[in-house]
Amino acid sequence: MNDAVRLCIPALPLGDALIELGRQSGLEISFPPAAVAGKVSPVVRGRFPARLALDQMLEGSGLALRAEGANRYLIYVDQPDPTHASRLDPVRVYGEQLGERVYSRQEIATTPSSNRDLSTLVATHPAVRTNPGAHGAQNRGSLDIEDISFYGASPYQNLFQIDGIDATNRVDPANKNLAQVGGNVPSNPQSYFIDASLLEAVHVHDSFVPVEYGRFNGGVVDARLRRFAGENHLKFDYRWNTSNMTRQRVSPGQENKWTQGEPGFTPRWQKRFYSVVADIAVNDKAGMVLAMSHRQSRIARWGLSADDAGKSLRTPNNYRDRIDNFLGKFSVRPDADTLVDLTLKYSDRSEALTSNTARDTQYANNHGAYGLAARLEHRLPAARLTLQAGWDHAMSNRRSTSREWVTTRPYRLPVYFKGGFGREQKQQDTVLLKGRIDLDPLRARAFTHNVYAGIDAQRIDAAFKRPKLSTAYTRTYGSTGGYTDSNRYLWRPGTVRARSQTAALYLSDRVEWRRLALDAGLRYDHESLFGSHSVAPRTRLDWDVLGSGATVLSGGWSRYFGGAVLETALEARRLRLLQQLTDFRGNPVPAGKQDFAVDYSGLRMPYDDEWAFSLRQRMAGLEGLLGYVRRDGRRQWIKSGKINTGFTYRNGGNSTTDAVSLTLRTLEPWRAGPTRWHLQVSWSWQKRKTNTDLAKGYDDNARGPNDRVIYNGAPIRTIDLPPRSFHQPQLAALTLTGAYPRAGLTWTHTLNWRGRRDDIIYVGRGPGPSFLDRYQSGGLPSYWTWDTRLSWQPPPVMPRLELTIDILNLLNRMPAIVAGNPTLASNNATYQSGRELWLQVGYRF
């Protein structure tokens, strides 16, 4: 049966799911009850050939199928051990919708990786761009998570979810400043730093994004937790890497910072990762999956102190960077029509730092979250109802033991700094309720309607907290030993809050007529803090050219409204906790001159308009997809002003991105003798114009249409200046995974290619009378890297033992990836990280 059919099958016991598939598709499926006992089928929802849906249901089950005639199949137990990691099962690609990419558990397990975070996993996606320095050698020992941008949209306007529950930081995600500054708390767009090896799958939506997703401009990254599969299992993994197993190249201009381990640089480290995953049966209707991991890196840094004579002295020590995860999902199926999931999530990252420029100054930057969620799926007579509820607490804080920051000016000796600002924290508490109903297909004459509707309500309570008073001042010594204090500031204790409530309604109908299908959706959002109302259409027209699902032309227009950044509302209230007592001469400063103002009146939600077109072709066991996407970003948030005159936020940012992509992948494994092979190839090209800097996010001011700069010696419009961040014109990736089940081997090769690009370097002001900003291009060549992973489970000896080796950048290519500034005396370019070796051992009970 090659004709595509519309299927809506929830996660069910495998036997029930196969019966339901036969009922909806007309297939005759036979299977022994013992073979499917204790196994659960994934959700199958969408329009595709029923035979392909059957493959999706059997993925990872240890079962295979054999054709017994027209539309008749027999399910039987496959001979290779289904728990064997090297067994290469079919890739789950058939159920993917246009604009969606699913990273399955099997793909995650076979992908060469370093820190196993979500950003690294999706970095080779054709729609995704990272900042150029993300692959650099200068900070390879860190466990920090890189930001990602979809189609030139803000990296701080993506939607991150865990099992459909929002896991996005809405407070101050763009702050990357690691320095000790009062009121400064670095953060990240992802509330949870999830270990990808603990997940069942990661769903990425980059275009044609369905109407149920809102509050984003860029893309959607939805991490799915594992659900109990019917059998008791326990798996341990230990993984390690050190700086001695990693080649690094650092430019002369950065060598001093790198050698001393200044924050943002890591010269020497030892990484140790531990993880445990347990599948536990409660009874024949209930079970749970508990997944835990501890990732740590011990980093050598040099701290500044003083000897007995008061002379500066640098001493080395080790500082820990760690991430802890705990993920739990309890699932119960009281009957064939009902499924209930209860989920617990916990993530905590702590990075201990020391200053190499301030004496006796140690501090820690922390980023963590924990939450609870519940999900109910219930089959009604003519529909399926899904209800979700969630609560999450997320925070970022900076802690130092000292609450006094002193700038000391000794008599005829160098100035030095010392101290800290105690504890300062930004946080958000999120309560979310969601409901959705999917109606069974409705047939009216020649048309078939597939309708679903839903509600999405969310409340975010954001806060900035400073528990205790901190002070900052300058102490200047005279020739007699006396001193005077000036520039005294009080960072007063307190808590400031802001609340944002959003409510959304959405409706979608897929209307099918002959070989045409129209997806028409509409989403309405209301946000309370900024008083924003938005209506977002989502449309897509599909033409099944041959009527078999093999050749599909698609095109559509959609609008994606972003979410609020609550730092804009917290900023003025936070600044009012700061009080200046004396000026730089030591004279008192009247309180009336310290009215900090932030104006965000009239601010509306930013949005991206998307025009997307694609051609999908399936033949000979392969699927190819050619796509074009145009994104017009409008009403992006910008910031202007100074602290002494007040800040103003406005909707002044605009961007335009054109993107072309081509992907090719196998639908089923290629078989060569006893081996099986999967292939995934992608290439993408992007061109972007913008009047803001993506890396600065909502803190950047916009450049006007008539503003001009000097670029390579010639004046041009500022809008024509090439992008400086999150820009890589061409990317390509090839992943080939092979398995030899009899020998217990799995071998993955990934080739990554980055095309040449021009880096943009600021080189100062031009001549008068205009004094325009001057920029110069720095040409960076194209280059390849080769990553590989080899896993071995010795079947005759210890089939449950797994040994893995990852080698990243096998050929040790280390070109410049960020150009150096030609005006500096020494080269300060950033280079690609070199060959990197990871070793891993795992055991499954």
Name these PLM-found stretches.
Residues N752-P767, T785, W792-F845:
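C-terminal beta-signal and adjacent terminal beta-strands/loops
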Residues K329-R349, H367-F530, A659-S684:
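Face-selective signature of the C-terminal outer-membrane beta-barrel domain
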Residues N232-K235, G264-S350, H367-L380, R384, ...:
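Transmembrane beta-barrel wall of Gram-negative outer-membrane proteins
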Residues L58-E59, Y94-P210, N217-V220, R224, ...:
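Periplasmic N-terminal accessory/gating domains of Gram-negative outer-membrane beta-barrel systems
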Residues Q428-T430, A446-N450, D456-Q458, G494-G621, ...:
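Structural signature of Gram-negative outer-membrane beta-barrels, strongest in the C-terminal barrel
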Residues Y73-D78, I148, V185-F193, V204, ...:
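N-terminal periplasmic accessory domains that precede
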Residues E512-A517, L625-V763, G842-R844:
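Gram-negative outer-membrane beta-barrel transporters
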